C-alpha cells in the first residue's frame, strides 16, 4: 500500500519547504506552499509565521507592485494577529514599504505622506519596542523630504517679494515650522517666515514670535544674531535658549564625539 502520509504533508514540512524556496528566490512557489498551509491547516501553530512570510516575500521582491502587495499582507497580518509581538514588526515594515517607494522632494508626495503616517503610528503604539529608534530615524528622514518639498515652494514665493507671493510663502513656511521642527532648515524657515510677516503692517506683530523661536530652539543657528537684532529693533525681550534645545545640542555633540571616536579607531 502507498504511504498516504506523503500525500498530505504536515504543516511543519510545508512551512520549511516554503521557507527554503523563498530563501532561494523562488517567491511564487514559496507563497503557493504557504497559502496551501494556511488553507489546509487553519489551526496550525505555523499560521502566523506563514502569513508573515508571505508579506516578507513580497517586500523582499521590492518592485512597486510587490511593495503594494506587501503593505496589504502586513495589514492583513495585523488584523488577525495584533496580539502577537510580530505585529510591531509588521507595522514597521508597512512604513518601510512606503519609504522605499518615496519620490524626491519635488515629485509626488503620496508615498512619503503614507510612510510618515505609518511611522508615526508605530512610535505612538510601540514606544518601548526595539525597532523604535529605527522607526524614529526613518520618520525623521521622511519628514525631511516632505519639509524640503514645502521649503522649495515657499522659497520660490519668498524670493518673488510681492504681497501675494509673501502670503503664499507664509502659508508654506508656517506649516514647515509647526510640523517639522527637526527639519535641517527649520531655523532658516523661521527666519524667512518672520521676515515675510514683518514686511506687512497687518502681520508684522506676529513676526517676533518666530525670531524668538530661532533664539530659543536653535541656539547654534547662523540666524541667531540677526534674530536677536530684529527682536531688539522691535522692542521685544530676547529670550534664552530653551532647556530642550540645549539638551538636544548636548546629545548631538555626544553623538558626534562617538562617531569621531569610531572613525579614529577605524583609522588606527
Q: What are the language-model segments listed below?
A:
Residues 1-268:
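Acidic, polar-rich low-complexity tracts and alpha-helical solenoid repeat scaffolds
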Amino acid at each position: 500500500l502507498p504511504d498516504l502520509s506523503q500525500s498530505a504533508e504536515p504543516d511543519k514540512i510545508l512551512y520549511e519547504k516554503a521557507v527554503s524556496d523563498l530563501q532561494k528566490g523562488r517567491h511564487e512557489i514559496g507563497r503557493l506552499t504557504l497559502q496551501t498551509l494556511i488553507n489546509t491547516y487553519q489551526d496550525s501553530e505555523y499560521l502566523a509565521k506563514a502569513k508573515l512570510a508571505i508579506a516578507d516575500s513580497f517586500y523582499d521582491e521590492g518592485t512597486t507592485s510587490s511593495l503594494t502587495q506587501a503593505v496589504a499582507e502586513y495589514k492583513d497580518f495585523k488584523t488577525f494577529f495584533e496580539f502577537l509581538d510580530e505585529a510591531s514588526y509588521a507595522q514597521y515594515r508597512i512604513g518601510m514599504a512606503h519609504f522605499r517607494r518615496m519620490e524626491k522632494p519635488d515629485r509626488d508626495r503620496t508615498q512619503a505622506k503614507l510612510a510618515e503616517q505609518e511611522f508615526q503610528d508605530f512610535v505612538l503604539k510601540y514606544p518601548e519596542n526595539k525597532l523604535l529608534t529605527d522607526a524614529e530615524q526613518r520618520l525623521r528622514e521622511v519628514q525631511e523630504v516632505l519639509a524640503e518639498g514645502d521649503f522649495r515652494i515657499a522659497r520660490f514665493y519668498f524670493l518673488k517679494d510681492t504681497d501675494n507671493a509673501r502670503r503664499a510663502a507664509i502659508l508654506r513656511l508656517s506649516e514647515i515650522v509647526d510640523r517639522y521642527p527637526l527639519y535641517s532648515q527649520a531655523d532658516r524657515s523661521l527666519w524667512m517666515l518672520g521676515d515675510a510677516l514683518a514686511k506687512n503692517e497687518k502681520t508684522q506683530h506676529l513676526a517676533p514670535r518666530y525670531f524668538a523661536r530661532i533664539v530659543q530652539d536653535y541656539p547654534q543657528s547662523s540666524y541667531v544674531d540677526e534674530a536677536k537684532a530684529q527682536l531688539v529693533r522691535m522692542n521685544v525681550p530676547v529670550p534664552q535658549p530653551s532647556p530642550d534645545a540645549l539638551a538636544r545640542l548636548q546629545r548631538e555633540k555626544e553623538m558626534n564625539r562617538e562617531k569621531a571616536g569610531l572613525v579614529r579607531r577605524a583609522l588606527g
